[in-house]
A protein has these predicted regions:
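Conserved catalytic motifs of ABC-family nucleotide-binding domains
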Residues: 153
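Catalytic Walker B motif of ABC-type/P-loop ATPase nucleotide-binding domains
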Residues: 157-161
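ABC transporter nucleotide-binding domain
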Residues: 176-259
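Short, charged/small-residue-rich alpha-helical element at the C-terminal edge
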Residues: 229-299, 305
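Conserved ABC ATPase "signature" region
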Residues: 99, 103, 110-128
């Protein structure tokens, strides 16, 4: 079963212009999905529909097999949400916020206390659990907001610009925590951001959206293959046969166009199995930013498609 299924989803606020236009996505369980696009592209509208905050104009969406819009209370039990504007109750402590939201989710008191201890420790907030949020830095408030989204142990986590307002170090720390928590608890993450560098660090699956339309969907390698992007494998070694399709560039350097990561292991294995020596391997590939602009603008690094 996929975690999220979206079919021909459309939303118009004025009956004329579509904020999102026939979006279709199928996201398997356990993926960290990066929904990437510029401001106003339709990312937040999509998340709000999936969370039941907005109704769609047409189309269908399911979360863990449950139809979005039919029983939003049930969906809220399995989903956690952290948006760009997520805020805590400043007059409450970090722990007080978690108690409040945990009880809202109907958590049993003993389980709630255990969960609070776990999350505060995991997010490095134990030392400030009894301090009011009003005294916290932006980075600490983001961690409290993430803790609130995770308090009821959701199976799906929606994150809309979770690093907004953070300096690079704090942004990286928050995303590292998100990735670790997702892997530890097998949580499916739906991450909306225009911070491509951060998305590249943690995402396993991508969707590119612009002007309400999904322009590309898949893993990095799948998206690159659809644009006929050829990755280059560079190998420095000795006694390497050219029968494996490698071009000898001189000075013990060899190269080969490859389709993705899966091909690299087989090439290295065959070289070594046939008596070759491998000293260094480098895979030269596009950055996520370059690939993104191939879909959004049709160019990357000055190369016109």
């Amino acid at each position: 079963m996929n975690a999220i299924n979206i079919s021909n989803l459309k939303k118009s606020y004025d009956g004329k212009t579509n904020a999102i236009n026939n979006i279709s996505l199928n996201i398997p369980k356990g993926e960290i999905f990066g929904f990437l696009g510029p401001n106003g592209s339709g990312k937040t509208t999509t998340v709000r529909i999936l969370n039941g905050i907005l109704s769609s104009t047409s189309g269908h969406a399911e979360i863990l097999g449950k139809t979005v819009g039919e029983n939003n209370l049930e969906l809220h039990r399995v989903c956690g949400v952290m948006t760009e504007s997520s805020s805590c109750y400043e007059n409450l402590t970090a722990e007080g916020n978690l108690i409040f939201f945990g009880r809202m989710h109907g958590m049993e008191e003993k389980l709630l206390r255990q969960r609070i201890d776990f999350i505060l420790k995991r997010l490095e907030l134990l030392d400030v659990r009894n301090k009011k949020v009003e005294a916290f830095s932006t980075g600490m408030r983001k961690r409290v907001s993430l803790a609130i989204a995770l308090i009821h142990n959701p199976q799906i986590l929606f994150l809309d610009e979770p690093t907004s307002g953070l300096d690079p170090e704090n942004a990286l720390n928050v995303l590292k925590l998100i990735k670790e928590l997702a892997e530890e608890n097998e949580v499916t993450i739906f991450l909306c951001t225009h911070q491509l560098k951060y998305a590249e660090d943690i995402c396993t699956l991508y969707g590119f959206i612009n002007n309400g339309k999904v322009l590309g969907f898949g893993t990095f390698d799948e998206l690159a293959a659809k644009k006929n992007v050829s990755l280059q494998l560079k190998i420095r070694g000795e006694n390497i046969s050219e029968k494996f399709g490698l071009i000898h560039e001189g000075n013990n350097l060899y190269s080969k166009s490859i389709s993705g990561d899966a091909e690299v292991n087989a090439i290295i294995h065959n070289i070594v199995a046939n008596g070759g020596k491998v000293y260094e391997v480098v895979q030269q590939k596009l950055s996520l930013e370059q690939l993104y602009f191939m879909y959004i603008k049709g160019t990357a690094s000055g190369v016109t498609l």
